[in-house]
Amino acid sequence: MVGVRFFFFKQKTAYEITDHWFQVPLTHGLIFSKGKDAALSSRFADQTITVFAREVVSTNETLTVSADKRPYIVYLQGGPGFGSPKTGSIGGWIAELAKTHRVILLDQRGTGMSSPLSARNITAVGDAQVQAEYTELFRADSIIADAEAVREVLLADRADKRWSTIGQSFGGFLTLSYLSFAPQSLRDCRITAGLAPIRTSVDNVYQHTFDRMKERNEEYYSWFPEDAELATRIAEHLRTHKEYLPTGERLTDHRFQMAGHFLGGRWRERGLHYFLETAFAEGNDHLSDQFLTAMGAEVTFQANPLYALMHETIYADGPADGVLPGIPGYELSPSPAPTNWSAARVAASRPEFAPDADRLLFTGEHIFPWYYEEDPSLRPLAEVANLLAEKKDWGRLYDHAQLHKNEVPVVAAAYNPDVYVDFEHSMETARWVGNTHVWTSKTHHHDGFGSDSLTILGHLKNMLAEVHNQ
């Protein structure tokens, strides 16, 4: 396999910021998930991709530990399909961690500056079957293999070649994969809103997230009771009138339900209220341009097709038959392939989420097959999306036995009201994964790390100090 190639660019302000580019094998993640033979026999075995990481460290000379001696910590972004945050104005958690660590903002493969995927370059690799084989190479196993390649280069001159991780949401899922496949590389791990539901089935995951979204809708309507009638009226209007988004496609009632993304965070619900109140601002017979423009921004996957394409695959942990020849001793996981459009199947059993229900309920992080009919940016990917949903031979995402005996210190924040990563499932995972310690909150939502990062970092720091002092 092709080795890692490394390039970098450095700039100095109040922070030292170094941009790194790595050339890594496209298929090396399969070694973790399916075995070395699978990586070598893939039709893509001789190809490489570019992985980008930005390193940030405070140059404040009053800090206790000099910049060159600080330990490394890599940030694992939520998603899937989103790049790491940019550093135009450094503050919040990045600034805080940069005082004590060299912070690595890794763009996961297929996102940001790391060989980003689009409908154009996915369809260019071949027919739908080839596309499915290609996109399989952008899951957690490959992201962790990339992180290992980055670590080996950046920490090459360190006596202790371990680094720490901090993962938000999907970044927590990645953390559990990292602890499965390369625990020897990790000093300690921090997880926020990302204790993945590894011990249950994908259908059970969605049953719980629909339950949480129903509760969140009820809470929202208790704050803005007039919006229950307004949202239902908008949905009825969309069934009887043709309304078009700025990109030219018709807005449907079930696509309008995607505005539930506003309810995923602690402070965005007021944004949903302001959004809804503009719907008939121009008159009662049509939806306003400002409403349709805002709606268009909410429902398009133009910038992040990987999120839609790969979202359910983050729950496909291993093959349907439980057989992985390249992984000795592999046992069938609690959530094997296929996912088979799980969210859509669960939604069909929940009439209260029907778009023509007496009172409209908004959906959350749920991917439906009709996305690929109604979103122009996803239409070219419809066939490969179906193949991924039906795929039975996924590699493993986790080594459950390794996680159960884990010794790497893990500190996590889990939130009772989280509508995307269910609290009950998170606590089940925490009980399974060894040496895991959880701080819980009844007031933070899924975006807690974004809206209250320093508070949460403080709790994690204190827990980690207690663990290291034991």
Question: Language model features by range: what are they?
Answer:
Residues R5-K10, P338-W341, M463:
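Aromatic-residue hotspot detector
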